[in-house]
Amino acid sequence: MTKNYHLLLTLLPSILLAQFDPPAGQAGSKAIFKNDPLFKSWATEASVVRGPQDIAASTVVLASVGTAVNATGIADGSGIVSLGDGGTAVLTFAKPITNGSGADFAVFENSFNDTFLELAFVEASSDGINFFRFPATSLTSTGTQVGSFGATDATKINNLAGKYKANYGTPFDISELPDHSLLNKDKITHVKIIDVVGTINPQYGTLDSVGNIVNDPYPTNFASGGFDLDAVGVINEFTEVLATANLSKSDFQIYPNPTNDFVQIKSREEIKKINVYSITGQKLIVSENEKIDLKNLPAGNYLLEIITAKGKITQKIIKK
């Protein structure tokens, strides 16, 4: 018993550090394959500001592989744009991304295996001006620099793009962003990718959300240095909610909204049917009752369609 106790104490630090999901294809991994039907669309435009191949070099030579357009469209693992140390890319979309149930979008890098991980911070904006960063965590030891082609354990990485190999996206959930008056989580228009640099030198290193220096392959002093952005796939798209011409939202009361368990509908018109849809259009509930039970639905945004003899109207509801 004493021997087992001491063994547990010896292993505990490594157990605590390996606390996030594993590489793509392993049990429990959150990686999403590029052809997963979850993806509704892909980034349509991109702008890139390159960083240097080596941020500490006396002569500045920028990363140069690929062009911004390579970051648009579906992931393919080969058509990429390299950002260099601290380089950035800003992506926009045909439709905004919305804060739905679970992950809302995913970022793809082109790593050739599960351990050579070039990482990036991810930020989102609803106006293209004010960006807010997803809380990222890196538990990789900073005692030794990860070399130019060194290995990183994916289970020590969370909310950093580049966690998985090529063709597998790192998912991001908008609900994890901080609440702010300048951020409309239901209508994200821009996603920014920022290379983490990777050096453990505090003069140039970058910090995660809890103050850890992010240690990833460094130096990457070649043309494809830094994060290699392949694509950004959209899972939850924003849907404009419009009333039909002959019905007005003032004719209805829907409460409570947001709700924990049910919504009640009061109407001036006789209600024929009520449908509840996921934000992506999947019909989840059909009812003729004015009280709709949502207890079995996960937290997120939904569309409530009310049908009367005069027409129909759709309203967004939020399940907490």
What are these regions (language model features)?
Residues 245-320:
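C-terminal outer-membrane/trafficking sorting elements
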Residues 1-21, 242-244, 303-306, 310:
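Bacterial Sec-dependent N-terminal signal peptides
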Residues 13, 188-194, 215, 270, ...:
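Intrinsically disordered, low-complexity repeat segments enriched in small/polar residues
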Residues 86, 129, 310-311:
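Glycine-centered tight beta-turn/hairpin loop motif at sheet-sheet or coil-to-beta transitions
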Residues 128-135, 282-287:
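Surface-exposed loop/edge segments in extracytoplasmic proteins
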Residues 19-120, 133-240:
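A domain-level signal for the mature, folded cores of soluble proteins
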Residues 15, 104, 117-121, 270-274, ...:
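Exposed beta-strand and adjacent loop surfaces of beta-rich binding modules
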